Structure formats: C-alpha cells, structure tokens
Amino acid sequence: MTSETVLEIRNVSKHFGAVKALTAVDFRLARGEVHALCGENGAGKSTLMNVIAGVLQPSEGEVLIEGAPVKIASPAVAQSLGIALVHQEIALCPDATIAENMFMAATNRRRSALMNYAQLERDAQAVMNRLAPIDVSQKVGDLPISSQQLVEIAKALTLDCRVLIFDEPTAALTETEAQVLFGIIRDLKARGISIIYISHRMAEVFSLCDRVTVFRDGRYVATEMVSDVTPDDVVRLMVGREISQLYPDKQPSSERLGEPILSVRDLGGERFRDVSFELRYGEILGVGGLIGSGRTEIAEGICALRPVTQGEIRLHDKVLRLRRYSDAAKAGVVYLSEDRKGSGVFLDLSIAQNIAALDLKALTSLGLLNSREERALAEDLTRRLGVRMGGVDMPVSSLSGGNQQKVAIAKQLAVDPKVILMDEPTRGIDVGAKSEIHRLLRELARAGIGILVISSELPELIGLCDRVLVVREGRIAGEVSGNEMTEEVIMRLASGIGPATETNLKASGHAA
C-alpha cells in the first residue's frame, strides 16, 4: 500500500425522497490497498459503492480519481475510469453463457461485426480457471448460486481496472472457494490495484485488509488501521452499542420432548435419498453441510418445490400429500429461499404488497383487497423485525440487502405458519441484524412454530441451533447436539474426513 490516493469521496450525500441514505460522507482509497468498509445493513455502504460505480448519482458532494473531480454518470463511465463492482446480489443474464456474461461489459465498449467468439470463450475460460474449473460454455441459469457468484467475480477480473469493489463476495461461497478468492485479492493488491472490501465477516476483514472504514446510519464514523483495532472495536463502531449476546438462550434439553411438529421418513428425490429426521416443539433444528451437498434440495422436497419419489412427511402426525408449493403453504409449511431476489421478494412491489403476497385471500373481501389491513399487517411485522425503511409503501428495491431479507422473512410469517424452512436466513446480514433475527427465530420456536435453519456459517449453526443435522452427498451423515456440536465435528461429517464416532452420531440411524 502507498500513500497515493487513487479514489476520494468528498462530502457525498444521497437522498431517496425524504430518506437520507448518505449524509456528507468522506472516504479515501490508497493505491494498492485493501480497504474494508463495514457497517450494519442500511448504514450506506452499498449506496456509496453504487455512487462510485455509476449506478447512482450523488445528491451532493464529489468523487475524485487521482485528484481530479469526475462525474460518473453510468456504470459504463465507471468502467472507462477503471472502476469495477462485484455486486452482493447476482446481476447476470441467466439465458446467456458464462463467457458471454463475463465479457458483456467489455464487448459493449468495443463491439465489432467480426467478434471472435471462439477467442472470447478461450479468454473467459482462462479467467474462470483462476477461480474454479467451471465450463464457461454453460448457461448461467443452470448454475447454483455459489457458482453464479464466482461468475460475478470473474466478470470483474476481465476488466482492466484500478479500483475493484467487492460487496460481500464470500456470502455464497464455500470455504475453499473463499480461500481461492483471497489469494486473487492479494495478487491484485501486489499489482497495485486498489480494493474496497465490504464484509460483515470480521475474520476476513482482519486477514485481508489494511484499513477499515465504518459507516453508521448513512454517516461516516471512523477510519482505522486494521492493526490498531480489534474485531470488538469495529463492531462497537458499527452498532454504536455493545452486542452482549448474538445468540439467544437455547431450549433446555428437558423440554425437547413430546410429539414432533414435523416428521420426515425415508424421503428421497433427485440429489437426496433416505432422509429421516424429526423437528420438535420449541427447538431450532440446524442443517449443515457443504454447498452442493443436497441441503437445499431436501428443504425444497419437503415443501413440494421439487419432486419427491419416496418417503413421507407428517405435520403434527398427519401425513402431508403435497403436489405444489401452494399446498405446502396452505398446510402451514413455508420456505425462505437462499436467493432472496430470485424467489424471496418482489423488488418492484411495495413492502406491504410483498408481505401480503402469500395470503391475499385473507385480506380480500368480495374480490377487493383491504389495503388498511394489508398496511396494518406490514407495519406490525416490519416493527417486530426492525426493518429500516421510509414506510411500508416504499418499494423493496429501496431497501438494503439485510432489510430485504427481513421483508422476505416477514412474508413467510404473514401466513401464520406451523413450520418455516429457512435457507441461509442471515446471509449477507450485519451482526446487529443477525442478532435481531436470531432472537426472532427463538421467539417463534418458543411460540410453537417449527424452525429449520440451513446455514453455511458454522458459528450460526452452533450458536443458534439446538441440534444440527449434517448432510453429505444427499444423505444425513450425522446429527450433533450439546457438547459434541463443534466446528470440527460438523466439518468432519460434512466432508467425510475420518470415521464418524458414536459420540458424534445419534443412535437414530443417521450415519451414512
């Protein structure tokens, strides 16, 4: 890192109507540094990055590149200035190939009637191979979320940039994929490229970054050398308070008795088989495993989002016969997707419309929607979940990623479910918002709702859940609880490294 400033933000504000997303913020990025930007969801991090990347225009203030004021009127202008943004949310064309997506921005700037697509594909494959051995001739829509995130990163690497912005780049990646990305970031830094790194994961901030800047409530708080602060210091700056307990108290084992809310027996389908477990009253059941292990497919099978070829599902000891997701929701089994923008929320609709979407019939009389009841429902749930917004009439697209996730959860709660299956419910959410959601999930469990949480974050599985099922290659490899619930035990079961001992596995036949 040098002392030379490559990018400077001076007194930038951004307003959306009466909502102030940014208020007179400053930011400086040195050449060849990795600079972390931290803050709770709604703090203004992504808004500032969108200003730098030309997606949004500032209401006030200026942006300087190497000391010269610039007007970044569009993403194309940003790219011409050497600025690239890797979005937290997937921004790819699903019907185009990986290669076409990777070079779409570059070819738009130098389009030719004699475009050599064979060469383009070879170049794309060379870049992609730095991250993962993924065939770039595939369509993006056929890839899992983690692979789509790698394509987003590869797309940015094809641009000749001096400033590269990563917005929660590891949220959908496996640990192995994340480590490959970290190596690439260190290589880019060594070549003098400046990196802005937005993350809620303190371990990544402290292992990768030179400096950290903290925003809170749309305002600049502080910039510190990473070597001069601790993770607790950064969290205190982010939230303006101490977070005394990220995870609520667990259910006492003595209460984990009685009839199960949900029973799954010998369930099988594409990419999963012989899945059996019970979800009991008052508990939060975790599901861990590597990405691609079949965790999501099991949840989708339970709620009829994908075909089931064998087994049975019982809700309060009554066999469920589900043909489609609407049958599951009507029965009281709902699913929160890991892809909140793909299937979790409708970005262009209002917050109130999103929350009411699963059960419009309950808010309708004689064919007319009762907008007063819709609004009251939305206001109640957004208050309980702590959604930061200008009002329930605002479009979901106006919210930060974490607040969009809260709306997605509120949408499921609006139908008074008996069981909620949550796939990565806190992915990309800051520590303060995570704490709120964890407390909410525990309250729901205590109220009698069955909660199943799929998570790639081992601390979340261990800290939040009463028991954890570990999935490997489409089957439940084991179940852990109590003192046996450690990261090492879960990872050994997930990866199949070494034998699974009897102390790690329950006697219920979960071992693969």
Swiss-Prot record:
Its main location: membrane. Its EC number is 7.5.2.7. InterPro entries: AAA+_ATPase, ABC_carbohydrate_import_ATPase, ABC_transporter-like_ATP-bd, ABC_transporter-like_CS, P-loop_NTPase. Signal peptide: none annotated. SMART domains: AAA. It is a peripheral membrane protein. Pfam families: ABC_tran. Residues 7-242, 257-498 form the ABC transporter domain. Coiled coil: none annotated. Keywords: ATP-binding, Cell inner membrane, Cell membrane, Membrane, Nucleotide-binding, Plasmid, Repeat, Sugar transport, Translocase, Transport. One of its GO terms (molecular function) is ATP hydrolysis activity. It comes from the Bacteria. It is an enzyme of class 7 (translocase). ATP binds at G39, E40, N41, G42, A43, G44, K45, S46. It catalyses: D-ribose(out) + ATP + H2O = D-ribose(in) + ADP + phosphate + H(+). It is found in: Cell inner membrane. GO terms for cellular component: plasma membrane. The complex is composed of an ATP-binding protein (RbsA), two transmembrane proteins (RbsC) and a solute-binding protein (RbsB). Part of the ABC transporter complex RbsABC involved in ribose import. Responsible for energy coupling to the transport system. Belongs to the ABC transporter superfamily. Ribose importer (TC 3.A.1.2.1) family. This is Ribose import ATP-binding protein RbsA 2. It comes from Rhizobium meliloti (strain 1021).
